[in-house]
Amino acid sequence: MKILEFDDKKGIMKLHIENEDDLWILHIILKKGDRVVAKTTRDVSMGRESRRIPMIIKLQVEYTEFQSFTSRLRIHGIILDAPERFGIKGSHHTINLDIGDEIVIEKDHWNKFEIEKIKRQEEKHLKMLIVLVDFDEYLIALPMKQGIRILAEKSLRTPNKEEENIIEDNAKEVANEVLSYAESLGIEVVLLAGPGPFKEIVSNFLKNIKLYVDSVSSATRSGLNEILKRDIIDQISRDYEISEETKIMEKIMENLAKNTGLVAYGKEEVKKSAEYGAVDKLLVIEDLLSSDEEERMEIEKIMEEVENKNGRVLIVPKDSPIYYEVRNLTGLIALLRFRIN
């Protein structure tokens, strides 16, 4: 996500959507009564026939729909402004927001939690290496905000009958270079891909790093372009975030089992802990942010209190492996820095 403009006084923010997670964040942040401006298409009567016309409209939000692992957010609402000649003001409409689109959001009041969530999403960048390997060549690339940086693009000794260990030696050479970059750049995860079995041999020498293995047609720049066109990088980023949520939940369950007093759950307990500045991590199921307006406002107030006192809020989607555990503990559960009772 990229913030293109933000006018705090007018409550207007313009955003560029870069990935699926951005759409999910907007699904959480957009509330009934907010206004959005975006490009859309609509069927308009033109004499005896109807045509789908592209246009820019301003919509007052009624509700939003988002399905995990899709690339579209549906924003339902009432048209506040549109080209006069079409006569559609006051009509119901749905804006389909996709990756690559821009949207202007206007709110009467931006909560600190909402602004921080968007800023964190803008800054979020998983440190990953893309490593493409084949028996005779390899390529190592670093995805960055400003584009892809090629770190290494090299040939390997061709396997032959006289030198039986060439394949294993080549695999060690690649693995050592990957590990060297991983250490110097603070890499968190490696995506290893290639056209044949050589990637599995290389993976045997990369045991101490988080590794994803995929197939690609070649270990060249065209293979790199092939990988970049897929959804796998977004999926890895999402998996990494889900892994973090899972670790927090494991710590919560450990503390509950030991009765340490370092866990709070339920609205009243968590609210009290937040007011004391005791909340380190807060897990909230997404249902609580799409329930009735009064409850949503209560939950958001707690979330904002946590953020204001340097705690971290993680929203747990329905497809998360810890969703049902969190839901069974009221859907709102906090790991505390210190006991308050």
Curated annotation (Swiss-Prot):
Molecular functions per Gene Ontology: endonuclease activity; metal ion binding
Single GO biological process annotation from the record: ribosome disassembly
Secretion signal span: none
Location relative to the cell: Cytoplasm
UniProt keywords, alphabetically: Cytoplasm, Endonuclease, Hydrolase, Metal-binding, Nuclease
One Pfam family in the UniProt entry: eRF1_3
GO (cellular component) term, any one: cytoplasm
Known EC number: 3.1.-.-
NCBIfam families, A to Z: pelota
Assembly, per entry: Monomer.
Role according to the record: May function in recognizing stalled ribosomes, interact with stem-loop structures in stalled mRNA molecules, and effect endonucleolytic cleavage of the mRNA. May play a role in the release non-functional ribosomes and degradation of damaged mRNAs. Has endoribonuclease activity.
HAMAP family associated with the record: PelO (MF_01853)
Family affiliation: Belongs to the eukaryotic release factor 1 family. Pelota subfamily.
Name used for this protein in its record: Protein pelota homolog
Gene label: pelA
